[in-house]
Amino acid sequence: KASGAGLMLVSFQFSELAQAAQTSGLAPAKSVAKDALDTWLTIDRQNQVTIYVGKVDLGTGTQTALSQIAAEELSVPFHHIRMVMGDTATTPDQWLTGAALTIQQGGSELRIATASARAALIERAAQKWQVPVTQLKVIDGVVIDSANPQQKISYGELIGKGFELKVDPKAKLKSHTDYAVVGQSIPRVDIPAKVTAEHPYVHDFKLPGMLHARVIRSTQIGATIASVDDRGARKVKGYVQTVRQGDFLAVVC
């Protein structure tokens, strides 16, 4: 493998494809329960909604689109939505970001979760006022009694410490004919920071003493490392070390 003026020679040997499948290892334990409603969103006393999704926005505007989905199903203003994306400690495991699945798969899951939340909050208001659920409606995050419009309460006042409920996979979704947010041309929330250079691109992010690792992979599935000659790489300016763990190989600089 060429790198600057140095050279690293790596030879691979190939075995059956099944061998590669057997080395996948165990997945780490999940930190949050995907079926818990509180995993997906929180609402504060000011009616601001924080949404947690396991996807990230790679520049395609999915943060804006997912915010629209959440605002629509919750019947809250778009600007009341705050999005936490891809934080592995606090967001649900929604697999990878890619293959056009963020909206198709991740958006569908978020839609069901927020529809569940909306139904749960309406139910709480109905119990509080001792009225039928069908008598209530939501406008901008405020539950209103249609028979007595002066009787109203915000989501933030209803939420308490949390939902403590499971996501209802059969939650009633809002009809497309009632959409007020989804389908609207809303300015993307990620653009301002990008055009003003405030956005911290990962390529420009550097901490004091931070190192870079280049992983060296075979072009063939199932290959194993037969030998490594890193004498040339060691001569490259900035070289720190070669790391080999079984068939994993990387150069740190």
Where are these regions (language model features)?
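Cofactor-binding beta-sheet edge motifs in enzyme active sites
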Residues: 2-14, 19-253
